[in-house]
Regions:
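Conserved, well-folded catalytic cores of nucleic-acid-processing
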Residues: 19, 37, 48, 61, ...
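Cys/His-rich Zn2+-binding cysteine-cluster or related metal-binding knuckle/ribbon modules and their
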Residues: 2-10, 18, 26-89, 193
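Long C-terminal interaction/binding lobes of large macromolecular proteins
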Residues: 98-99, 126-136, 140-194
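Conserved phosphate/pyrophosphate-binding and hydrolysis machinery centered on Walker-type P-loop NTPases
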Residues: 2, 20, 48, 60, ...
């Protein structure tokens, strides 16, 4: 028996299904929910996207020309932490241990997927390095993250700027038996003196 879905519901479900981790059934549930909302709540939801832009400096999402982090006078502008996405900025900020600024690439190099340097915010990064002492490569430890970090390092090091990479290791509170081989190898390579 075929399921009847009206055109507006199908369109809404199709859009929700584009979100990461949302399958067709969840997308349909979200679409039903959204279509039952009062119109003003739907408009508030839609307007949330309207006020978002990229920070002129770091390319993070913001509601102003220069984000709060870049405009914070207490931040060390001489250290830039390069990340893949705005979600990574949020993760670092939750940790509370970083006092520099960020640069969001909005992706990683991935020749297999057709993502090249021109598709990322690399030109913007290179344009803000004049007074920078250190660039921290905080891309994910995937093939694409490593390739992006190496590519950027080769561009930045000739400028006399220190380029570092996040250490790899074991997550706090985890057991060795659950760590994968690469994590254990990197943890051994990056061990520190007590």
């Amino acid at each position: 028996m075929a399921e009847f879905i009206s055109a507006p519901l199908a369109l809404a479900a199709e859009q929700f299904a584009k979100l990461p981790g949302i399958g067709i059934k969840t997308a349909q549930r979200l679409a039903y929910y959204m279509l039952n909302l009062p119109q003003h709540e739907v408009e508030e939801f839609a307007s949330a996207r309207g006020g978002v832009q990229l920070c002129r400096c770091c390319q993070n999402f913001t509601d102003r020309e220069v984000c709060e982090i870049c405009s914070d006078e207490n931040r060390d502008k001489g250290v830039i932490c390069v990340v893949e996405s705005p979600k990574d900025v949020s993760a670092f900020e939750r940790s509370g241990g970083y006092e520099g600024v960020y640069h969001v690439l909005h992706g990683l190099l991935s020749p297999m997927d057709g993502v090249t340097a021109e598709d990322l915010k690399i030109k913007e990064l290179m344009g803000r390095l004049s007074d920078v002492r250190e660039v921290i490569m905080a891309t994910n430890p995937t093939d694409e993250g490593e390739a992006t970090a190496v590519y950027l390092s080769r561009l930045i090091k000739p400028m006399g700027i220190k380029v570092t990479r996040l250490a790899y290791g074991l997550p706090a509170g985890s057991a060795l038996e659950f760590a994968d081989d690469v994590t254990l190898m990197k943890a051994l390579e990056n061990r520190s003196t007590l």
